[in-house]
C-alpha cells in the first residue's frame, strides 16, 4: 500500500542479548539523500565486492524500488532525538511480530510533521556511518548515476526519488545498539608455542588461563577481555584447554582491531592481505562456533576479540578510512521486506 503522505516509520526491536538479557533498540526508517563518500556525509566502515553490487543493480533496475534498507548509525550521546520521537512510539503500533530467532519487531508510522522535522533538524549536517548495507548503498549510487545520465539536461523533478535510498537510523550510543566482535579462526599453519608467542609479540602482556569446559568460554572471555576493552587484546585458543591472553597499552589514535591484524595476524602468523582474500581466515560471530571449528580440525587457532566502541568506528570513518574486513557486526539485524520504497513519485529526505 502506497503512503498517501510523507512519513517516517519507527521500529522497536525487543531481543535477547548474547548474555541472555532482554534489550530494546528503537530507530526509524526514512529517505536518505544519496551522497558520494568523498563528501564525508555518509561514511563506510568497510570495503565492498563487485559481484554482490552487480546482482543488486540488476534487481534495482527490474523493480525500481528499495526492497531493503541501509542501516545507519548517528551520534547522540544525550539521546536527544529519541526524546523528541518518544511521542510517536507512545501511539498504537501498526504491527507487532516475533521472528524465528525470538526478536519482537513493532512498527509505527510517524505522520506528525513535528516528528519528521525533529529528525531532519537533528541529522542535518551530521555525518552518519553505514553499519550494514554497504553494497546496497553503493548500488543506489550507481543506479542514481544511470538515471542522471539518462535524464541528461532535460530537467524535470528537482529531487527525483532515485536520488534517495530507504534507510534505517539508530543512535550508536543507545543502550540497545549492540556492536559485537567478529572473531578470527586461522585455518592452517603451525600454532606458536607460548615462548614463540612472547617472542613475536614484544611489549605485549601475557597470561595463560585454563579453560575447563567450552560452556564456560563466554564467561571466561568476559572476565579476561572485558576489562581490556579499547586496548589491543585477544585470547588465543588452540583447543588444548588453555587460553593464551595477550594485551598491551594502546598508542595514541590507535584502533585495536588494526593493531591485532598488523601485529598478530600479520606479524605472528605471516598472513597478508592476499592470503586473507584467499580465505586464510574464517570469521565466526559466536566465540563458541570458533571454538568448535578448532576442535573439529577446521582451523588451528581461534582468536577471540573484544567489540569495537562507537568512538573507534566514527574516528576511522571521519578520517575517510575503513576497518579491516569483518571488524564488527550489529545486533539485532533488520528484518527484510518490512518496508518498500518506490523509486517513482515524490521523496521526503531525512538526512
What are these regions (language model features)?
Residues 1-351:
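Surface-exposed, charge/polar-rich loops and edge strands
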Amino acid at each position: 500500500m502506497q503512503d498517501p503522505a510523507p512519513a517516517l516509520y519507527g521500529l522497536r526491536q525487543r531481543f535477547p542479548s548474547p548474555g541472555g538479557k532482554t534489550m530494546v533498540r528503537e530507530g526509524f526508517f526514512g529517505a536518505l539523500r544519496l551522497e558520494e563518500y568523498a563528501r564525508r556525509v555518509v561514511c563506510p566502515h568497510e570495503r565492498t565486492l563487485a559481484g554482490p553490487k552487480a546482482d543488486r543493480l540488476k534487481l534495482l533496475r527490474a523493480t525500481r524500488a528499495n526492497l531493503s534498507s541501509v542501516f545507519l548509525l548517528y551520534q547522540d550521546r544525550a539521546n536527544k532525538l529519541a526524546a523528541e520521537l518518544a511521542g510517536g512510539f507512545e501511539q498504537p503500533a501498526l504491527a507487532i511480530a516475533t521472528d524465528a530467532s525470538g526478536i519482537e519487531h513493532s512498527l509505527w508510522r510517524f505522520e506528525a510533521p513535528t516528528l519528521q522535522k525533529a529528525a531532519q533538524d537533528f541529522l542535518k549536517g551530521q555525518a552518519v556511518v553505514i553499519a550494514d548495507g554497504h553494497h546496497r548503498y553503493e548500488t543506489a549510487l550507481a543506479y542514481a548515476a544511470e538515471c542522471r545520465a539518462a535524464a541528461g539536461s532535460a530537467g524535470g523533478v528537482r529531487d527525483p526519488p532515485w536520488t534517495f535510498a530507504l534507510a534505517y537510523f539508530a543512535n550508536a550510543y543507545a543502550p540497545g545498539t549492540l556492536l559485537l566482535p567478529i572473531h578470527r579462526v586461522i585455518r592452517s599453519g603451525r600454532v606458536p608455542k607460548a615462548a614463540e608467542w612472547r617472542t613475536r609479540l614484544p611489549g605485549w602482556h601475557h597470561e595463560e588461563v585454563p579453560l575447563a569446559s567450552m560452556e564456560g568460554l563466554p564467561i571466561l572471555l568476559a572476565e579476561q577481555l572485558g576489562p581490556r576493552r579499547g586496548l589491543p587484546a585477544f585470547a588465543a585458543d588452540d583447543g588444548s584447554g588453555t587460553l593464551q591472553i595477550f594485551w598491551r597499552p594502546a598508542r595514541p589514535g590507535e584502533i585495536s582491531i588494526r593493531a591485532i591484524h598488523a601485529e598478530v595476524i600479520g606479524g605472528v602468523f605471516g598472513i597478508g592481505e592476499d592470503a586473507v582474500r584467499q580465505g586464510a581466515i574464517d570469521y565466526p560471530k559466536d566465540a563458541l562456533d570458533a571454538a568448535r571449528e578448532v576442535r573439529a580440525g577446521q582451523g588451528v587457532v581461534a582468536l577471540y576479540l573484544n567489540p569495537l566502541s562507537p568512538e573507534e568506528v566514527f574516528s576511522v570513518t571521519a578520517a575517510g578510512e575503513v576497518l579491516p574486513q569483518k571488524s564488527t557486526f550489529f545486533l539485532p539485524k533488520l528484518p527484510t521486506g518490512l518496508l518498500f520504497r518506490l523509486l517513482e513519485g515524490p521523496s521526503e529526505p531525512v538526512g
